[in-house]
Amino acid sequence: MQKLAELYRGKAKTVYTTEDPDLLILTFRNDTSALDGQRIEQFDRKGMINNNFNYFIMTKLAEAGIPTQIVRLLSDNEMLVKKLAMVPVECVVRNRAAGSLVKRLGVEEGLVLDPPLFDLFLKNDAMHDPMINESYCTTFGWVSEPHLARMKQLTYQANDVLSKIFDDAGLILVDFKLEFGLFNGEIVLGDEFSPDGSRLWDKTTLDKMDKDRFRQNLGGVIEAYEEVAKRIGVTLD
């Protein structure tokens, strides 16, 4: 599949068109960002790790009946995907308190959330991805009520699948975000799942094994990503 024009360049991925109008090439770069892209550093192997990590997770979710945009791996850092009309809303599930929830409510980090919380955020870096609710989505026309309900259902289903995968690997899935789009009128899971967009803690030590290591200057970012990948069975080079 030939890579043509650059369609979109995000904080850590670049999207290219192909000769097929329904297919895109997703390229994972070594960039790592924080503070809505204000702080950016590069880490060797990160693009390769996240590409293979994402393919592994998306394959597991597809096997569980969740429609995803993946088609196939093209290289260490490239993947062929379906072209989705992306919904500008992020879905977040929180199994434990961390990040913005702790800051907003003053609850203890690590507090078990049962049942898990479901949050929505508008994708807008300039506005720091503001938290919204379901009525905002329909009133402003970001996504229809039926499609939003489907996104919520698939996010919870993904949480069930992924929580078990990580638990079996000695890890806690603290929280994560998912993004969806439309393909032929149907809601499909897009973007990525990796330690960039999730929080993963070691079950025994509670060590952070995700991008919080970068955000909080803990060091060992790539080592943590590789360890998580190894534990769940992701094949790296």
Swiss-Prot record:
CDD domains: SAICAR_synt_PurC (cd01415). Keywords: ATP-binding, Ligase, Nucleotide-binding, Purine biosynthesis. Pathway: Purine metabolism; IMP biosynthesis via de novo pathway; 5-amino-1-(5-phospho-D-ribosyl)imidazole-4-carboxamide from 5-amino-1-(5-phospho-D-ribosyl)imidazole-4-carboxylate: step 1/2. InterPro entries: SAICAR_synt/ADE2_N, SAICAR_synt_PurC, SAICAR_synth, SAICAR_synthetase, SAICAR_synthetase_CS. The keyword Calcium does not apply. Its EC number is 6.3.2.6. Pfam families: SAICAR_synt. This is Phosphoribosylaminoimidazole-succinocarboxamide synthase. It comes from Sodalis glossinidius (strain morsitans). The lineage of its organism: Bacteria, Pseudomonadati, Pseudomonadota, Gammaproteobacteria, Enterobacterales. The gene is purC.
